[in-house]
């Protein structure tokens, strides 16, 4: 079996409710990718010390599973990247689904020498007033910053040169990596760009269970890089709370 070109890394902590649909979505996209580009993608699920059936379900669905015992999202992503065999990396959350063309678009992005990496637009799986308002603010931030962290992707060589995700922070590690990629890409004439015509669909579980003002406060904090805050697991406990799953 030939080595995969693209490795999709899915960090997962107690995600038995969502992991199967995420993997099946990625498998459909991988089928299109192989047909359209003649390349293969591997799906790596990082079991981040789950206490439920996350790892077993992932294996049943055909994903590679690696274990990371320390509950830290950056560390989990890095463990997946270390196990990856592809020259291109993409990171997908366990409660996400992808459009069937997305892996093709990511491949084309990373084949372009003028692009250092990128992300995608994020669409919620359903909408109400609260959800729509949150994503209106989020999309404004993405439009002005040009830092979209949905399905973030880059070349493995660049990822390794940067040391991967910062394991000293408990949230917004993907935002930090995006800015790091922009920094190394700029002198090389490369841009960090969002993929067009493909996106991810995400669950609304955390917005459903969290007051809007709390979500917006944390979004502003992460967006403006409050380094002291994102290094506090207590401040970021919203992302590590079993009740939100």
Give the role of each language-model region.
Residues 5-7, 42, 176:
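Cell-envelope/extracellular polymer assembly enzymes that use nucleotide-activated donors
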Residues 15-35:
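Short, well-formed alpha-helical segments that are part of the catalytic scaffolds
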Residues 25, 43-55, 96:
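A conserved acidic beta->alpha catalytic loop
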Residues 53, 92-108, 179:
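Acidic donor-binding/catalytic loop of UDP-sugar-dependent glycosyltransferases
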Residues 68-84:
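Glycine-rich, basic loop-to-helix element that forms the pyrophosphate-binding segment
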Residues 89:
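Short aromatic/hydrophobic "clamp" motif used to bind/position activated sugar donors
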Residues 100-130:
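Conserved donor NDP-sugar-binding/catalytic core segment of glycosyltransferases
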Residues 158-161, 169-189, 193:
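A short, conserved alpha-helix in the catalytic core of glycosyltransferases
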